[in-house]
A protein has these predicted regions:
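Short, small/polar residue-rich loop motifs at catalytic or cofactor-binding pockets
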Residues: 13, 293-297, 318
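Short loop/turn motifs at secondary-structure junctions and domain boundaries
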Residues: 71, 290-294
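Radical SAM/AdoMet-radical enzyme domain recognition
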Residues: 108-129, 136-250
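Canonical Radical SAM [4Fe-4S] cluster-binding loop centered on the CxxxCxxC motif
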Residues: 70-72, 76-108
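Short Fe-S-cluster ligation motifs
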Residues: 114-134, 343-344, 378-405
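C-terminal accessory region of radical SAM enzymes
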Residues: 214, 252, 260-288, 313-362, ...
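Cysteine-cluster motifs in flexible loop/terminal segments that predominantly coordinate metals
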Residues: 346-393
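N-terminal [4Fe-4S]-dependent radical SAM core
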Residues: 2-28, 45-78
């Protein structure tokens, strides 16, 4: 509901979220108070509500000053050592399996030289991923060398790489964090998603890390209609063991575009709300303007043949930035092709300019929108609808938390 230019109200439960778009701020007020605001009878509001409007600058029409994000070499690089995988998840966006063995992959020496180049270019963190990195027989050597170079190191594995305790200890001594894929604490439900035997692989790895005292463990849990019933039980397991987790529906990319395992809109909303509520820090912050999802600004990915992409979910020609055999990273990020990244924000995306949520969502995940619309500037309205519901839920939750402090 539009109250005036750049001031909107959204019903939530029995109250109203009052949102100043340009200031990216919001209090929660009663429906009765909203009527007074609509009539501009501010003096008739309670003293506490008047204070809310002042503190949250609800009546200001001046936009916040936004520092322009200049495209420079991001500080985090994802290094996909292989696209081979010993699992066959029904929703895998990369369609990884044991046949994904590309010709002319980067050699042992080239990976070492790449790590040195990343260090020299100012990259701070490398995250080794796949496929399953445990299938690259030199993965431990690359991780060790990155650590010796002084880079912060992380990895993503289905558990294969840490299946042996000596490997788990070796990695715990060198990695800042490790991310493991586990969809459910229920073995049958997990393996319906990821394939027979996957539960044991993941749990063995998690137990090995916990046994040696490594606790900076993250879990990626993907929810489909196969494992929806065990979500709460799975969350409880993560909490009991001090494991951070990311919970979400699968992306309709790769095998996920063909899988008949989708959640309904309401199921997705419930899962995403649970995931956002569990995050260590809120994904919304008052008085913060978000103009993009961060595509190409915070991270990039290099695949097994040296191709460089702006996002690990967007290994397509439209988002390819170059190849490390042909281009130096510094040259790529000074090249005119980086104009692509600069255009991936709400000022260039279809329909975003008139949406009241634009500075809160930043246009949403570009990968999701791209694969739904096949357009680098496209926007999928169903994704927008879901994100708006999640934003309202978090706006309300954040406000209630501030009221209690």
């Amino acid at each position: 509901m539009k109250i005036k230019e750049n001031l909107y109200a959204y019903p939530f439960l029995d109250e109203m979220i009052l949102h100043n778009v340009l200031r990216s701020s919001w209090p929660v007020i009663s429906k009765e108070e909203l009527e007074l605001v609509k009539l501009r009878k501010y003096s008739a509001l309670s003293e506490s509500t008047q204070k809310k409007l002042k503190i949250f600058q609800l009546l200001l029409d001046e936009p916040l000053k936004v520092k322009k994000n200049e495209v420079t070499i991001p500080e985090t690089a994802y290094l996909a050592l292989t696209h081979q995988c010993n699992l066959k998840c029904v929703y895998c966006y990369a369609e990884a399996d044991m046949t994904k063995n590309y010709p002319d992959q980067l050699s042992f020496i080239e990976w070492f030289q790449l790590l040195e180049q990343l260090k020299d270019c100012g990259v701070k963190k490398v995250i080794f991923t796949g496929g399953e990195i445990g299938l690259n027989h030199d993965s431990l050597k690359y991780i060790d060398y990155a650590y010796q170079l002084g880079l912060s190191v992380g990895l993503i594995t289905n558990g294969t790489l840490i299946g042996k305790k000596r490997n788990a200890q070796f990695l715990a001594d060198r990695c800042e964090s490790m991310t493991i894929s586990l969809d459910s604490i229920d073995k049958e439900e997990n393996d319906k998603n990821r394939g027979r035997g996957c539960y044991e692989i993941a749990m063995r790895g998690i137990r090995n890390l916990l046994d040696i005292g490594f606790h900076n463990i993250y879990v990626n849990a993907t929810v489909t209609n196969y494992n929806l019933k065990s979500v709460d039980q799975t969350i409880e397991f993560f909490k009991e063991n001090g494991i951070a987790y990311k919970l979400g529906g699968f992306s309709e990319l790769g095998r996920g575009s063909m899988a008949d395992i989708s959640l309904s809109f309401e199921e997705r909303k419930e899962i995403e709300c649970k995931e956002k509520s569990a995050q260590r820090s809120a994904f919304l912050k008052p008085f913060t303007i978000k103009e993009s999802c961060g595509l190409g600004l915070g991270e990039f990915v290099i695949n097994p043949v040296g191709d460089i992409f702006a996002c690990k979910l967007l290994e397509t020609d439209d988002y390819k930035l170059g190849n490390i055999r042909k281009n130096k990273l510094a040259d790529i990020y000074n090249h005119k092709e980086i104009e692509l990244l600069e255009s991936q924000n709400i000022h260039h995306l279809s329909g975003c300019q008139t949406c009241s949520f634009r500075y809160l969502c930043g246009g949403g995940c570009r990968a999701q929108h791209y694969y739904h619309t096949n357009d680098i500037h496209g926007v999928d309205r169903s994704e927008c609808q879901l994100l708006q519901e999640l934003i309202k839920n978090q706006m309300y939750r954040i406000w209630k938390q501030t009221e209690m402090t």
